[in-house]
Amino acid sequence: MPGPTSRSDSPAASSQSAVLSDSEFHARANEVLSAIEATLVSWLQEDEIDIDSQRTGGLLELQFPSGSKIVVNTQPPLHELWLAARTGGYHFRLVGGEWIDTRGGGEFFAMLSREISAQAGRPLVIARSAA
């Protein structure tokens, strides 16, 4: 029986990220972080939920009213986005214009929305773009 598949050998990991320049990666990753922040601001303005956020460079930390946290972090050397939540850590690479989990194949915004909903205790969906 073959051994475990490494991140770089998994089908989900073979992605368009290999052809991205560092500046393209930074631009695409920044779009993701900005979209998350824009959604949080919208929720606050609409009295939907107050999730505090703090962004430092490529790291965005979300803190929920319960005190729990979700962290989204860019990993420039790997051209990946990392998501840390109660359920674990996930690594995403850009594949066909979408950020896809390198292990399970899930899409970033769907997984982030699921994690936010679980930690907020109600359904919430993160918008894909800040526009």
PLM region descriptions:
Residues 2-131:
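N-terminal intrinsically disordered, cationic/polar leader segments
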